[in-house]
Curated annotation (Swiss-Prot):
It holds the Pfam family DUF150_C. It is found in: Cytoplasm. It comes from Shewanella baltica (strain OS155 / ATCC BAA-1091). This is Ribosome maturation factor RimP. Belongs to the RimP family. Transmembrane segments: none annotated. GO terms for biological process: ribosomal small subunit assembly; translation. PANTHER family: RIBOSOME MATURATION FACTOR RIMP (PTHR33867:SF1). The keyword Cytoplasm applies. Its main location: cytoplasm.
Amino acid sequence: MATLEFRLAEMLKVPVEALGFQLWGIEYVQAGKHSTLRVFIDGENGINIEDCANASRQVSAVLDVEDPISTEYTLEVSSPGVDRPLFTAEQYAGYVGEDVKLQLTMPVDGSRNLKGAITAVDGQMLSLKVNGKELVVALDNIRKGNLIAKF
């Protein structure tokens, strides 16, 4: 997680948890004047639109006071969804046996894009079975990771 995203997660964790939700993760996508801050929340019984609206008001109030982003951006608060992004070792460990899609910073086995089943998480290392081959990826090498939804 980038430094700004880490700082934002630390800043927003308590206010989101005060509403009874879990702060699942943060994505900040810079695109000039059209930057987007995505805040993913989850709850024991899932998340509905009213939950997102309440969390958005709380998050917006904190961001207005703390002002961690100096440029213009759009705030989006949502559920992680069925193809949820994964951010932490604990989140990856919770989905051992499930299929994921990873975008890497540095290639592993000649590729920056991997699809496979999580076989283990050991500290900051993720083991993945890709096309019958076991690969190990450092979590800090993962630019983006998502579950692959099964229908």
